[in-house]
Swiss-Prot record:
Domain notes: The long N-terminal helix forms part of the 'assembly lobe' of the SAGA deubiquitination module. The C-terminal SGF11-type zinc-finger domain forms part of the 'catalytic lobe' of the SAGA deubiquitination module.
PANTHER family the UniProt entry points to: ATAXIN-7-LIKE PROTEIN 3
InterPro entries found in the cross-reference section: SAGA_su_Sgf11 (IPR013246), SGF11 (IPR051078)
Sample GO molecular function, one term: zinc ion binding
The protein, known as: SAGA-associated factor 11 homolog
Ranges where the record places region Disordered: 61-84, 133-182
Family: Belongs to the SGF11 family.
Source organism of the structure: Anopheles gambiae
Length: 182
């Protein structure tokens, strides 16, 4: 490999590189070739870079993002009304309403589950309330929840006797079954 091939030349030190550079730059023909080479390389790289960017923008659809959205021809008007922002949009939060399938009432979404539970009588207190209703309707009216007096004469036979009180059992540790000590 000779020095003039231009493929790869190694220099011993920096001083030798500087001497070789000065020797090439002292010749006007070599300077012109080097300047033309640098100029053409810069122009080629710039054109190729722009071509790749345009191609990529068209392929990915990001060309509109580079160009931006066209400006509106009419200027924005500032709206000064209650419950609206400066552009006229409503700024109040609208609660989502649900329709109760049981009573056909409109209930806020945040209250729908508790409403439905009470409306259908499925809540935790519903069994107590139902027991109270049964007791109240039994006391009022005919005396029988189901509406008939025909079973009243049979009730005296089995419910007339007083029940005997259970004797509480004492455990081996001296405490009663309900937890109280004797």
């Amino acid at each position: 490999m000779s020095e003039n091939d231009g493929i790869h030349i190694e220099y011993v030190d920096e001083q030798e590189l500087k001497r070789e550079f000065r020797r090439f730059m002292s010749d006007p023909e070599t300077r012109e070739k080097a300047a033309n080479y640098l100029y053409e390389s810069l122009v080629d790289e710039t054109i190729l870079g722009i071509a790749y960017e345009v191609h990529h923008a068209n392929k990915t659809g990001s060309g509109a993002a580079v160009e931006g959205e066209p400006e509106d021809s009419k200027p924005y008007t500032i709206v000064d009304q209650p419950d609206t922002d400066v552009f006229g949009s409503s700024n109040t939060k609208k609660a989502i309403d649900c329709h109760c399938p049981n009573c056909n009432r409109i209930v806020a979404a945040s209250r729908f589950a508790p409403h439905l539970e009470k409306c259908m009588g499925m809540g935790r207190n519903s069994s107590r309330i139902a027991s109270r209703r049964i007791a109240n309707t039994r006391d009022v009216g005919t005396g029988n929840y189901f509406g008939g007096d025909e079973d009243d004469e049979d009730d005296a036979d089995w419910s007339g006797e007083k029940r005997k009180k259970k004797i509480s059992q004492v455990r081996t540790n001296g405490s009663k079954k309900n937890g109280k000590t004797s």
